[in-house]
Structure formats: C-alpha cells, structure tokens
C-alpha cells in the first residue's frame, strides 16, 4: 500500500502555478508534469514509460546521494569502481521501479504547496494525494541544496531511502558490494522481463 500511494503521488496531474521563486517546488512541479504527460493518453508499455520519465528522473533525483544513504557506513569501504557500478545499477532500478509504479497510479488528485519548508540542511516540499477510492496521504519530497530530490516521505515520516536500506541490507550483509550490485541488476531485469498484467 505504501508503494502504491507513492506511485499515486508521482502520477497525479501537476497544479499549474509558477514556482520560479522556489526552486525546490519547481523541481517537484516538473516531476509531476512529466508523469502526468506520460500517462495522459494511457500507460503504454513499461519500456515506453522508462523512456518517457527517465530523463526527468535523472534531472530531479540525486542518485549518488540516495544510494550512499541507502547503503550507509559500508559505502566508504567500497572502491570507486564499485561505487560507480552500484550507483548506475541503483539509478536504473529506480527508474524502472517508478515507471512500473506509474502504470498503477492514474486517477489520483493532489495538491502541492507553493513553497518549501526547511528540513535540516534540505527543503521539504509537501504534497497531498487523494486516491481514486478516497484515501488521503501526505507525500513529501526532500530536496537538497543542489535542488535534487534525495528522499520521498509518505505521511511525513515513511522514508523511501529507509525502505531501500532495508531492502539492500540482506544482499549487502551476504555479499558486500558485489551482492548489492547483483541484487539491483536482477531486480531490475526481473521487472523488465515480467509480462504485463492482463
């Protein structure tokens, strides 16, 4: 349910308003606009959605910061080559995961605050999502000083990065950097190979 609600937030139609005076809000507005355009005429195939949203995700999310936070202290033990390979595998997995969620997220409504609020050294952009069946959720985007999103929070405290840390923990413990890399690649390839639901 948590992943579905996050997906709903990402697929909602953007609220037309200028966010030029708040770069953090502008990032979220641009993200929503791209997702909305992607599913406006139907979800299409997973590959279609990956191609459509990948560049916007690349501009909007700080993958190096996200994977570093998801791995935790062990990140410093990896070689630069391992860090680079894992970051790329994380990026690819993230894009495919969000494109996959997008197929299930049409029909939601949401509101974006027109300004961000401080959250430590970052800014938090609050959005409110209403699913087609009437469920309400708060989805916050944590935007860093480089105006890149580095976390997504459900109901203000359920962290996407914390979820990634939990997911990556077992392969990290069992196989270190190689275990994480293998896990991410296999999970991504599995989503791409899956047959669409009827």
Each PLM stretch: what is its role?
Residues 1-6:
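Bacterial N-terminal signal peptides that target proteins for export
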